[in-house]
């Protein structure tokens, strides 16, 4: 299964390797479709591929870290 989402990183999380952590800790493949990152905000269009349960775990991880997740 594939799912595309927009991620909006708050200032506090911009420099954290959250995409790396998701790829390492969950059985999902991440594909950055588009991104714009500054010191104040990070905007990422991301495609997640994997089992639905693993994709949901990855999304919940982002939310717990303060990232806004919106479906595309």
Question: PLM features: residue spans?
Answer:
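Long, contiguous binding/interaction regions
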Residues: 1-43, 47-72
């Amino acid at each position: 299964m594939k799912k595309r989402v927009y991620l909006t990183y708050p200032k506090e999380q911009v420099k954290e390797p959250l995409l790396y952590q998701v790829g390492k800790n969950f059985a999902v493949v991440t594909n950055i479709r588009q991104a714009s990152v500054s010191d104040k905000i990070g905007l990422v269009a991301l495609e997640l591929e994997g089992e639905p349960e693993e994709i949901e775990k990855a999304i919940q991880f982002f939310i717990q870290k303060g990232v806004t997740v919106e479906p595309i």
